[in-house]
Amino acid sequence: MGIFSRFFGKKSESKQIGNSIIANPDIDSPVGLTIVFKGALDINNDKLLTQLKSIDPTIKDIRYEMPFGQLEEGICLLVSWGKHVIRIYGLNAPYPKDVLELCVTPANYGQEIKQQIYESDSHLLLYYVGYEQDVLEQYLALTHLAACFEQFNALAVINEDAHTSLPVNFINALASENDGLTTLVACLPLLFCGFVKYEIENIKGIWMRTYGANKFGLPNFAALANSYEESEYYFDIFSNILNYLRQSQAIMNPGDTMEMGDNRMMSLRAPQDDEYFLKDQGDLLIIEINN
């Protein structure tokens, strides 16, 4: 078995041949998370697996493989359990500053930890290359593993596709609770579909929107709020709609309307030409609520 096939997969092969871990060759655009660290990477693989077993005692077959052996600089690792295979790249270099600003600045946690993240020294890239088909389950597998890196001076978990991040100690606390990660399932904009607020020059109000829903095959949503005080209101609306669409496999289109109670009606529309700042990968629907 060649190194390339073991790390990147081969069409004719299944998950494992002999004792080798095989990445799924049918995943072209894997979901991923990034972990940033204080100081140089100093990962003990055995302790990593022990922590994962501690978080989820039902895991019985967890194992890892270093396809390129022990590297002088950085990390190259495959971790496997059940249907899951996660590919890890590690670099003793700061994560790009522009991506950190994109994902950390709008996140809803304290400035002190944000400053530590901006000053981080190294990072890991985690990609899901296993055999679970459900994108949410792929994200949960990544999150379970990401939580285990707190012991190695990890600071935060970054989701670049979702333009958001969370402190790793918060994620580890959730993962260590019974069904704690269901919080991230119920509130997709916390980590898997980011919730971003920003002001646009010459536009009255605050734009609020999601990022990353396209990874689930869903549209992103946006709304023009009156003020930042409506953040929780729109966060809940986005969460509820995304969960409804994911669970029901329903489809929403521009022009659709929905009753919301209290004599309010929600309508959906596509971005207009002068709302170019809302356009990116995948579809986006703008929510308008009328009394």
What are these regions (language model features)?
Residues 26-28, 139-142, 234:
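Active-site-proximal structural scaffolding
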Residues 2-52:
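N-terminal alpha-helical "arm" segments
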Residues 41-114:
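N-terminal low-complexity, intrinsically disordered segments
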Residues 23-25, 114-121, 205-216:
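Short, compositionally biased low-complexity segments
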Residues 161-291:
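Aromatic/basic-lined ligand-recognition segments
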Residues 40-43, 131-134, 228-231:
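Short acidic, S/G/P-rich loop/turn micro-motifs used as interaction or catalytic elements
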